[in-house]
Regions:
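N-proximal low-complexity "stem/linker" segments adjacent to membrane-targeting elements
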Residues: 1-27, 31
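Active-site catalytic pocket residues across diverse enzymes, especially alpha/beta-hydrolases
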Residues: 33, 60, 128
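Short, surface-exposed connector motifs at secondary-structure boundaries
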Residues: 35-40, 105-107
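Short internal beta-strands
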Residues: 39-47, 136
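Active-site-proximal specificity loops/subdomain of glycosyltransferases
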Residues: 51-101
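GT-A fold catalytic core of metal-dependent nucleotide-sugar glycosyltransferases
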Residues: 72, 76, 91-138
Length: 138
């Protein structure tokens, strides 16, 4: 029996209006996931209802865990640094501060909530980005 690999941290950022799309994205990730990997799903948010959180927790399985990270306090601490515009929501900025908010995590994947996953994220996570701070896909 193969031993499962370390957890792969995957981050989403959304609000209560967008969490349903996050759930579709997560389901597509689960549909293509390696059974040998463990995926730790972090949902960065300021206002996801308990009802929607329960629905997303119900998606957990042996390979996927979900945690909701309420980032309102952190957001208030950096708000003066953020140029807010009509076309940028606060959740747009969460991805920029993942490394600062989670210093215990050395490497992670961020995915937009409206992305459909067509391959296994374990392969993407295994890719060596060297000393680069960010790696990106199209």
């Amino acid at each position: 029996m193969k031993e499962k690999m370390n957890k792969i941290p995957v981050f989403y950022a959304c609000d209560d209006n967008f969490v349903k799309y996050t759930m579709v994205s997560l389901q597509s990730m689960m549909d293509h996931a390696s059974k040998e990997a463990q995926y730790e799903i972090h949902v960065l948010h300021t206002n996801i209802s308990e009802e929607m959180q329960k629905k997303m927790y119900a998606m957990e399985n042996a390979n996927f865990s979900v945690q909701f990270d309420h980032v309102t306090e952190y957001l208030h601490s950096i708000q003066e640094k953020l140029p807010l515009r009509d076309y940028y929501s606060k959740t747009t900025y969460f991805r920029l501060f993942i490394a600062e908010m989670f210093p215990e995590i050395d490497k992670a994947i961020y995915i937009d909530s409206d992305t459909v996953v067509l391959g296994d994220f374990a392969q993407l996570y295994a890719y060596d980005v060297g000393d680069a701070f960010v790696g990106a896909c199209r």
